Amino acid sequence: MNPISTLTLASLIILTLPITTTLLQNNKTNCFLYITKTAVTYAFVISLIPTLLFVQSNQEAYISNWHWMTIHTLKLSLSFKLDFFSLTFMPIALFITWSIMEFSLWYMHSDPHINRFFKYLLLFLITMLILVSANNLLQLFMGWEGVGIMSFLLISWWHGRTDANTAALQAMLYNRIGDMGFIMMMAWFIIHLNSWEFQQIFLTNPKNTTLPLLGLLLASTGKSAQFGLHPWLPSAMEGPTPVSALLHSSTMVMAGVFTLIRFYPLMENNLTVQTSTLCLGAITTLFTAICALTQNDIKKIIALSTSSQLGLMMVTIGINQPHLAFTHMCTHAFFKAMLFLSSGSIIHNLDNEQDIRKMGGLYKTMPITSTAIIIGSLALTGMPFLTGFYSKDPIIETANMSYINTWALLVTLIAVSMTASYSTRIIFFALLGQPRYPTLTRINENNPHLVNPIKRLILGSIFMGFFISMNTIPHTTPQMTMPPHLKFMALAVTLLGFTVATELNNMTHNLMFKQPSRMYTFSTTLGYYPTTTHRILPYLSLTMSQNLATTIMDSIWLEKMIPKNLTTMQKTAASLVSNQKGLMKLYFLSFLLSITLGLLIAL
């Protein structure tokens, strides 16, 4: 085994050690928390070495020493694929999880089950690393389902709250819809290629792969909360803030986009799937950006921004730039985790207040958190020379020079401008102006478990974009010349969004409207989608089921089939065996005539 595979396995083994210690002894002390955090830290440091070796040598590695089973001609083995994608993403996921775990020591310190919470976070990370490094579809599916079940357990962490249980159930059900597409893809490959190994699938490169790739797109739509299967993502904010930070930055929602990137050798020549991915991503990034403009919950605004950025990654995959989408996925992880941790700092200090209208003036009382939110918001909008700029600006430039689907380009540009608008809105309402929270609120930003993770992520949000983009190899011929108006398009729409949002916030800060407009209601209710899918459609289906049950069971079976049918049968049988016809009037008339004739004869 070469150093890359050896050190990668060492980092994975280190992560499993805290899990095995819980099987040997009952960890009810806080030592387990620090053991887990230290294990993630050591795994991060060790994982940097294989990444640096890969950057130097540019040689992939495969580990396939563990044979599992053989079913007829199908050989199943446990194998790891250590290429550019996995070796780049693993240190990022470990670094962010390390920061989130340290933040959780402060945020969740009063939780009586904090040891189990750390165990769940660690399992969440391990399942994502299994997905990233998988070399076959079976192992990928194990990681895929692993992040799904861990997200369910973590979103419903505060299971005493009905909203948390409902949100976890939503996440599970929407992902079950996507999993049908994943299983369909696995079935297609096992029927037509008799293999789940990535090397054999990519080398064979079958021609008609539209059906399995559409199944993969459906799976990614559910996992990455694209339009149609997106309502679970804002609802998932019912979980603790560290869960939201890990779920949105480097685990659950990134799994769908990463799987599409992994299958780019099959997608790059399939125009049907590429166009579907492009249009789906464009609709998602615009729709969620519109919904984020009018939300007042700070966590939901950041959650909808995640969905919008995932749509932007899908657009990038749709224009056949998977490496650029992966770069944006890596850079996005830093500032998105920082935004969630900063919002968690504000929420915790303001006694669980999440409404940005009840904040204000926090730049004076929480300077480090305010700095992190400003830097994270600027990086999210693609401000030059921050982390987001090195991935978002090339995406817009590539889309401008692409020859496919101008409609999707225009929609994406509008969404990029709206990103600047809702980022400005967070800064304006939460950080600036006069304080709007209770005067006796106790705010403390001096805990090192709070400050140190945010500081590390601030550095990552400033510098890591440069290093990641420098080591991303372009796989298409770059444009040597570009018109200036296209070159500065991304910066122009971002500045437009900043300007419009600032002016509107200043103009309407003290205004009150009596009746919301239809567009405002459309945005605040997330396009009526949750109302339609979670209320109207279930009500209609239940009503129809009740009517059918009433008609079939009560009217047909219980009323007509048994009582009325028995009555009809008995009446028919009685009329057949009896000579009485039941004509009472005729009987009385004949009786009357007989009496009358008898009397006349007697007289």
From Swiss-Prot:
Transmembrane segments: 4-24, 35-55, 84-104, 121-141, 177-197, 213-233, 241-261, 273-293, 301-320, 325-347, 366-386, 413-433, 457-477, 480-500, 583-603
Disulphide bridges, residue numbers: none
Family label: Belongs to the complex I subunit 5 family.
Description of how the protein assembles with itself and partners: Core subunit of respiratory chain NADH dehydrogenase (Complex I) which is composed of 45 different subunits.
Keyword 4Fe-4S on entry: no
Listed NCBIfam families: NDH_I_L
Source species of the chain: Mammuthus primigenius (Siberian woolly mammoth)
Localization in the cell: Mitochondrion inner membrane
GO cellular component: mitochondrial inner membrane
Molecular functions (GO terms): NADH dehydrogenase (ubiquinone) activity
BP GO annotations: electron transport coupled proton transport; mitochondrial electron transport, NADH to ubiquinone; mitochondrial respiratory chain complex I assembly
UniProt topology in membrane: Multi-pass membrane protein
Pfam families: NADH5_C, Proton_antipo_M, Proton_antipo_N
InterPro entries xref list: NADH_DH_su5_C, NADHpl_OxRdtase_5_subgr, ND/Mrp_TM, NU5C-like, Proton_antipo_N
General function of this protein: Core subunit of the mitochondrial membrane respiratory chain NADH dehydrogenase (Complex I) which catalyzes electron transfer from NADH through the respiratory chain, using ubiquinone as an electron acceptor. Essential for the catalytic activity and assembly of complex I.
Protein name: NADH-ubiquinone oxidoreductase chain 5
Assigned EC number: 7.1.1.2
Keywords: Electron transport, Extinct organism protein, Membrane, Mitochondrion, Mitochondrion inner membrane, NAD, Respiratory chain, Translocase, Transmembrane, Transmembrane helix, Transport, Ubiquinone
Catalytically driven reaction(s): a ubiquinone + NADH + 5 H(+)(in) = a ubiquinol + NAD(+) + 4 H(+)(out)
Principal location: mitochondrion
